[in-house]
Regions:
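Nucleic-acid substrate recognition interfaces
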Residues: 1-187
């Protein structure tokens, strides 16, 4: 290679997820149940307001989870980022429901049922989601939760978000989304 062709190039890597089993205490289970319920409630409230707004004006109103915190004060008890991610999920559901590339239009997104899978996603902001001593995972508004850390991420991987889910048998899992910081390599 000639010296004029050598240089640094920035490469961004893909995300990677690792799923861990977690063992919450009774208090943490109650907080998880509250968060699951609040996420479902906010999703259904926002969906209702969007449908009613569309039917009355022909346009979808811009709704946010904070609009409901005065009427439903218990929403302040749970992680605000989990509620913000509910808004993102609803936007994605509307994009998919009205995407013209599909052969048929499915109409409005469906409401979340209490029988549906319990899960929520929270973002990592300045270390709010972290693996501690290879025994615990710190989660916003929950605290340190005992976990089975069977696979470690490399040090150059940073936690981007975490999705907490409860299976039908009552077991809890956390899926940690990792993002590698961009690297500069010599080419």
């Amino acid at each position: 290679m000639s010296s004029s062709m050598c240089g640094l190039r920035e490469i961004k890597m893909a995300n990677k997820a690792i799923k861990y089993r977690i063992y919450p205490t009774t208090e943490q289970r109650i907080m998880f149940a509250k968060t699951f319920g609040c996420c479902r409630k906010v999703y259904n409230l926002m969906l209702t307001d969007k449908i009613e707004g569309y039917r009355s004006t022909g346009e979808f109103p811009n709704v946010t989870p904070t609009q409901y915190k005065d009427k439903y004060p218990y929403l302040k008890e749970v992680d605000s980022l989990a509620l913000a991610n509910v808004k993102m999920n609803l936007w994605a559901a509307f994009r998919h429901a009205f995407n013209k590339s599909y052969k048929k239009n499915n109409g409005f997104p469906k409401f979340k049922s209490r029988k549906a899978r319990n899960s929520y996603t929270t973002n990592n902001q300045r270390g709010t989601v972290a693996i501690i001593d290879d025994k615990y995972i710190r989660i916003p508004k929950i605290g340190k939760v005992k976990a089975v850390i069977h696979r470690k991420a490399n040090e150059d991987w940073k936690i981007k978000s975490a999705t907490i889910s409860q299976e039908r048998d009552g077991s809890y899992y956390i899926s940690v989304l990792l993002n590698m910081t961009s690297q500069k390599i010599l080419i």
